[in-house]
């Protein structure tokens, strides 16, 4: 994704000249009042200030963001409100004439925005060919800054201003406009009040179009160059990391325009994610089902580019070999390693590397059910591993009868939620392959959940509704525009080998979470960690994520949106259900007496086929 850096100036005499000045100073978009030259606030002005022909149609759409007249369509005064609405609708009509798919920016003045919301709702319906509406919101209530200069402010006044949170202004409008993908938020920073970390984190879960940085936020460094203070650098960096564009707001006579643009372009370069998988951000994907579907070579290739995972598997096998075979037995004792699912060979390489590093003798059995993967593995046996004691079997591990039992059983059957690729069922079925004192790598997996706010993910779920029951699915997603309402907590645990007399892989658990700030619940995040051997672990739990590992994206279980209040406790109940043909999850927010929708009953949406 390419970012834009926008120059915002009011009171300009010429939009083409503003564009020329902006582009000469390394900006690629401009923002200014739709009423350049200060058109009087008369709804039926007969003398327009500029014609449509001063720019081409493509330039109107790609280079200009219009700010609407600063009128209050929600004024408590009837006459002022009606007059404001006429002016506002005149501006909207002019903008639609100039920009059939352009961008309009309107400022929220306070919590009362019902009329504005109804206008935006009408203009953003699916059958209406409009562009985007950018809702400009201060990151904190501007009223709070005034108390720093007032000695007469009472505690009640301060508390009231703190409770009048601009996020709620935005949220109320967003709810009325039904989470429209055409309605995005533009967050205005201010030099009078720096937001808390939790405030910033919450905004990251919103569909952010841009942040506005006023020129007053810049300071001169020792080289007399315009920069942001360290605290603001960090805040701006967080927004850049979720693809927020930058709008620099200045007065028309500012002489440091180029310095501002160059500086924020450097911030963008320093903070944007250049990872090879960033094109998957916020995409919803149906989880793989490798037990019943054969993976293609592209999928294998993506997994194999993760060096961290296979290095940790190698470390685990290495440690197990050292524990299993003493130095005195190294040249004589053979360790049988059984690999459940060979893919294109990365785990086999990890086993051979571990054997070489420990100087232990191994015999490797590779059990792989994918006939296409077998072809690649067979070629590797002939060309790369001709000197190895390795044997390939084209079998389902649950139906395989081994020539001998394994000392170490290695598998890579974990999904984004730990057990969602049916590792318990697979490893239970493969238990007969392992010696009574054999080692399973991994030997334990734990799933985790937490409540999430993500307007972008919710919008993506809603776009799938016409085709299938999208709120009854769990998705794999590279979570980007999210707010963690509370930290993840452990859900289900599975231990291997499971030698219980009656194995039951169904589960049910209720987990409670605290709401730290007013927000909206859009769904449930799902993660896992696994212990490979002893203290060697892999994790995608945000609290303990294995550095540099990207083989697994988290899961996202959708819910209907609900506004939550600071201090509230919510409980989430999760089920893992099993029948003769499938495994599935069900989930529900259980806040008595107002239990929310029960999702994926009987696995009618997302399920894993046995």
From Swiss-Prot:
Keyword Transferase: yes
Residues at which a protein binds: 303, 412, 421
Active site: 412 (proton donor/acceptor), 421 (proton donor/acceptor)
Places the protein is found: Cytoplasm
Keyword S-adenosyl-L-methionine: yes
Region Interaction with vls: start-end pairs: 470-610
InterPro entries per record: Arg_MeTrfase, Arg_MeTrfase_PRMT5, PRMT5, PRMT5_C, PRMT5_TIM, SAM-dependent_MTases_sf
An example molecular function term from Gene Ontology annotations: histone arginine N-methyltransferase activity
Matching Gene3D superfamilies: Divalent-metal-dependent TIM barrel enzymes, Hnrnp arginine n-methyltransferase1, Vaccinia Virus protein VP39
Tissue and organ distribution: Expressed only in ovaries.
Record: residues binding S-adenosyl-L-methionine: 300, 309-310, 368, 396-397
Enzyme class per UniProt: transferase
Record key words, sorted: Cytoplasm, Developmental protein, Differentiation, Methyltransferase, Oogenesis, S-adenosyl-L-methionine, Transferase
GO cellular component, one term: cytosol
Main subcellular location: cytoplasm
Disruption phenotype: Flies are viable and do not display neuromuscular dysfunctions. Strong synthetic lethal phenotype in the presence of a hypomorphic Smn mutation.
EC number: 2.1.1.-
Domain (SAM-dependent MTase PRMT-type) ranges: 284-587
Family matches, as PROSITE patterns: SAM_MT_PRMT (PS51678)
Protein purpose: Arginine methyltransferase that can both catalyze the formation of omega-N monomethylarginine (MMA) and symmetrical dimethylarginine (sDMA). Specifically mediates the symmetrical dimethylation of arginine residues in the small nuclear ribonucleoproteins SmD1 and SmD3. Required for arginine symmetrical dimethylation of piwi family proteins, piwi, aub and AGO3, during germline development. Required during oogenesis for pole cell formation in the pathway controlled by oskar (osk) and for abdominal segments during early embryogenesis. Involved in nanos (nos) and germ cell mRNAs localization.
Family (UniProt): Belongs to the class I-like SAM-binding methyltransferase superfamily. Protein arginine N-methyltransferase family.
Subunit architecture: Interacts with vls.
Name the record gives this protein: Protein arginine N-methyltransferase 5
Species classification: Eukaryota, Metazoa, Ecdysozoa, Arthropoda, Hexapoda
């Amino acid at each position: 994704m390419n970012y834009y850096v926008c120059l915002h100036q009011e009171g300009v005499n010429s939009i083409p000249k503003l564009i020329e000045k902006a582009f000469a100073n390394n900006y690629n978009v401009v923002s200014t009042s739709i009423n350049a030259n200060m058109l009087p606030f008369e709804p039926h002005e007969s003398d327009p200030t500029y014609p449509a022909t001063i720019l081409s149609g493509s330039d109107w759409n790609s280079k200009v963001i219009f700010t609407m007249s600063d009128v209050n369509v929600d004024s408590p005064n009837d006459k002022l409100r009606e007059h404001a609405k006429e002016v506002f609708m005149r501006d909207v009509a002019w903008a639609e004439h100039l920009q059939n798919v352009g961008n309009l920016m309107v400022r929220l003045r306070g919590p009362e925005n019902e009329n504005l919301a109804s206008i935006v709702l009408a203009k953003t319906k699916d059958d209406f060919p409009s562009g985007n509406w950018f809702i400009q919101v201060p990151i904190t209530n501007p009223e709070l800054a005034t108390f720093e200069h007032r000695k007469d402010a009472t505690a009640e006044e301060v508390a009231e201003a703190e409770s009048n949170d601009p996020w709620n202004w935005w949220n109320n409008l967003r709810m009325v406009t039904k989470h429209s993908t055409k309605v995005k938020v533009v967050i205005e920073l201010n030099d009078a009040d720096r937001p808390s970390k939790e405030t910033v984190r919450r905004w990251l879960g919103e569909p952010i179009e841009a942040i506005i940085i006023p020129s007053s936020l810049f300071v001169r460094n020792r080289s007399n160059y315009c920069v942001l203070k360290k605290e603001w650098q960090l805040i701006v960096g967080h927004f850049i990391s979720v693809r927020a564009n930058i709008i620099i707001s200045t007065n028309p006579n500012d002489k440091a325009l180029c310095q501002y643009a160059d500086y924020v372009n450097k911030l963008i370069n320093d903070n944007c994610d250049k990872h090879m998988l960033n094109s998957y951000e916020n995409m919803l994907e149906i989880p793989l089902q490798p037990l019943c579907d054969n993976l293609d070579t592209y999928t294998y290739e993506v997994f194999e580019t993760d060096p961290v995972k296979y290095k940790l598997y190698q470390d685990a096998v290495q440690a197990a070999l050292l524990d299993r075979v003493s130095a005195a037995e190294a040249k004589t004792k053979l360790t049988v390693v059984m690999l459940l699912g060979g893919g294109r060979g990365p785990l086999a390489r990890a086993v051979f590397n571990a054997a070489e590093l420990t100087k232990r003798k191994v015999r490797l059995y590779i059990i792989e059910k994918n006939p296409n993967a077998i072809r690649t593995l067979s070629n590797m046996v002939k060309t790369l591993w001709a000197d190895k004691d390795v044997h390939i079997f084209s079998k389902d591990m649950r139906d395989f009868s081994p020539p001998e039992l394994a000392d170490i059983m290695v598998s890579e059957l974990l999904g984004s939620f730990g057990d969602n690729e049916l590792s318990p069922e697979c490893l239970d079925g493969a238990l007969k392959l392992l010696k009574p004192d054999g080692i399973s790598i991994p030997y334990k997996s734990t799933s985790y959940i937490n409540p999430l706010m993500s307007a972008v993910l919710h919008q993506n779920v809603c776009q799938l509704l016409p085709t299938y029951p999208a709120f009854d699915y769990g998705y794999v997603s590279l979570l980007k525009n999210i707010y963690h309402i509370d930290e993840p907590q452990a859900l289900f645990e599975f231990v291997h080998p499971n030698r219980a007399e009656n194995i039951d892989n169904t589960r049910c658990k209720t987990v409670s979470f605290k709401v730290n700030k007013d927000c909206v619940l859009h769904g449930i995040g799902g993660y896992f960690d696994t212990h490979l051997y002893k203290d060697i672990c892999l994790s995608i739990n945000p609290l303990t994520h294995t550095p540099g590992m990207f083989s697994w994206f988290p899961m996202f279980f959708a819910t209907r949106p609900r506004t939550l209040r600071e201090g509230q406790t919510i409980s989430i109940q999760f089920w893992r259900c099993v029948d003769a043909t499938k495994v599935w999850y069900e989930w529900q927010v259980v806040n008595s007496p107002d239990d929310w929708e029960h999702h994926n009953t009987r696995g009618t949406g997302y399920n894993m086929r046995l």
